[in-house]
Amino acid sequence: MNVITPPFADGVDPKPVCIVADDIFETMTARRKIHFSIYVIFKKNVELAEPFKLLYYTEKKNVAHLDGSVAQDFGLPMWTKDDGQRAPDLSRQKNDYIKLDFFTNINNPEDGFSYCWTDCISTKNTTMVPRQLMPPSKRSMKLYLILPVEESNIMVLSEKAYGSLQLMKKHRKMGQPPQRVGCYINFNCQTSKVMFGCGHVYCEQCLNSWNDKPCSVCLKPVTSEPTQLKLRQGPCPFDLCSPNSSTMGIVLIPCGCHVMCQNLEDAYERNKHHLEPLIEKIKYCPFEPCRIRVRKLKKPFWHQQDKEHTLEMNSA
């Protein structure tokens, strides 16, 4: 799934927080799902300072622009102190996970949602009775999951992607982690990324001060709105391939989902002057929360990292 780190205002001390930038409400109602699961997997030992939260946010604004303080301070806690021993453990170990299940009545979405959780820790592995979540006050609102942890410390997967990950582990087919997606102006910027029509990648923070300048790498004029990249986590959704350190992957247009697939990248290079058959073969975005019709393909280019900078597998 698409996990982003929100920007904080100047002078504010950033705290660990990230946003799962896939609208849970849209994922369920548009796809007519009655049940949707999210796995939050911890890649390091982490001490959670507070519960996960659910936040309604207006559709008219890009969630990538949501201030980190708002993401941290607002929203509905998914569990409280009153849950006592039934609440997920706040002390997490590497490879632990918390599974979140969401339910809705597709014939009457006005009834809202219900949700429950399951903690993989043996003493806590009890799924709660589903809790009701009221629908948004306006139809334009979207529902996001807020996590009180640094983006680099977790992997957030749909149930399908989690199953693919377990299959890869079973066959020991994990491969080398792909490169970190770095902004050409500020490599260490943690905010979400965008791609210009030329394929070069920048962060949202630098984009805000762009002022109609040409791309700083190729000097081509910026003639259209940049594509918001969705750097999804998990295995390759097409063939569970293992990308190498030179893999750039392919961005699907218009959804902006980045597919870290070496085989797709190779097919793109072979057919880049006649991509229509490849686009028709893909047809729809393969990621479960998206599934938007693919109209174009674009190979992205980002600032190369130093060897010590690596992230875990980004792709679903």
From Swiss-Prot:
Tagged with keyword NAD: no
Record note on disruption phenotype: Insensitive to RNAi-mediated gene silencing.
GO molecular function: zinc ion binding
Positions annotated as zinc finger (RING-type): 183-218
InterPro entries assigned: Znf_RING, Znf_RING/FYVE/PHD, Znf_RING_CS
Keywords: Metal-binding, Repressor, RNA-mediated gene silencing, Translation regulation, Zinc, Zinc-finger
Domain of life of the source: Eukaryota
Full protein name: RNA interference defective protein 11
Annotated source species: Caenorhabditis elegans
Gene: rde-11
